[in-house]
Amino acid sequence: MGLVTCKQEREAELQNRQIDTQIRIENQANKRKIKMLLLGVTDSGKSTIVKQMRVNYLDGFNETEVVNAIFVIRNNIIDAFKNICNIILHSDITVTQEEKVLVKLFAYESGKIELMQEVDELNVINAVSGYECIKQFFERFAFHPMVPDHIHYFYPNLDRIASSNYVPTAEDLIHMRQTTLGVHEISFDYTKHIIRLIDVGGQKTERRKWIHFFEGVTAVMFVCSLASFNQTTEEEPKAFVWESSLNKVQNKVLVRSAGKAKVEKPGLINRLDESVDLFKSIRENSFLKMSNFMLFLNKKDLLTKKLTKVVFSDYFPDYKKWITNDNSDVSVAEFIENMFREGLEPEKRMYAHLTQATVTANIEGTFALCCDVIFGKNYEDTNLE
């Protein structure tokens, strides 16, 4: 009887050890899985960051994506020239009779260009890009609110892009603008962890889907474009009415008073204001109470360039109360960061980073800094349990 009891005890002890081992393995596996949510308003640079992660930690872009990018990039350029030509026709820039034919085609009938045979499409792109009125535009209105950010990269590269043997580079794909619809997820190994990065569309119609991904989120990376301070939301109607100088307050699509948005036309919302409001509403969500928050203040390069032509306080008068006679990128970026921190409870920590999503090394370094915080917090929470 005693031998039977001892055998049963040994078997029970062995079974307990096996269970404990399995629990440790499962706990270790759970530790290694990190769920990150990438959020932000449209055109903030979220998808560009995902592309950089693919370049850094996965296999980059496949052949099909490269081929498809030819058409997407050229459509990016056509859409940009549509806005540019529309602005030109409503400004005091001189347009010759010869130039006016293609300028009006881009401004009012750009859809016809997209339907052209490739050789004809390339001919009109190359022709209009060399016009004197286009050169004047970039000298005077390069940072007009209606000018998409990517054209500052594509325009200097048009000779290469608008050629019949064009093959997009990885850098071209990173600068390419393609609206994120639905949910895009990638997973990759990073040190001893498995990162699950989820990118959800930033358009207003897409945001109702976000809540389905809030549970179990280790970190939220919220992306804001620093250069969006003179832009309005993309989904709202736009009016093409401009004066010839960007420095006049009456030329602004948006007029601000006492730090509050007052719009000339109903429905127009300043994109930076929208980004701040969205961040704060997400920060208060109960599902994300224990999540780390990383703020990516993106497009710092465009902010620097834009501030040489545009006065920040014309859009945010409260900036003058914060600092006087300073339109520098450093001060403006600090002011914008404070907009996000305002009203944030002390115990709710936020880690802010200045980023340039189109530069691979910048995102790689920033992501490493974020992971140092995220992994430490993740292990800390696990140990407390």
UniProtKB/Swiss-Prot annotation:
Q: Where is the lipid attached (N-myristoyl glycine)?
A: G2
SUPFAM superfamilies per the record? Answer: P-loop containing nucleoside triphosphate hydrolases (SSF52540), Transducin (alpha subunit), insertion domain (SSF47895)
A Pfam family (short name) is G-alpha
The record, for InterPro entries, names: Gprotein_alpha_su, GproteinA_insert, P-loop_NTPase
Task: Write the record's keywords in alphabetical order, separated by commas.
Answer: GTP-binding, Lipoprotein, Magnesium, Metal-binding, Myristate, Nucleotide-binding, Palmitate, Transducer
- Region G3 motif, as annotated, extends over 195-204
**GO annotations under biological process?**
adenylate cyclase-modulating G protein-coupled receptor signaling pathway
Q: Which Gene3D superfamilies match?
A: GI Alpha 1, domain 2-like, P-loop containing nucleotide triphosphate hydrolases
Write down any Gene Ontology CC term: heterotrimeric G-protein complex
| Listed name of the protein | Guanine nucleotide-binding protein alpha-5 subunit
Which organism's genome codes for this protein? Caenorhabditis elegans
Q: What's the gene?
A: gpa-5
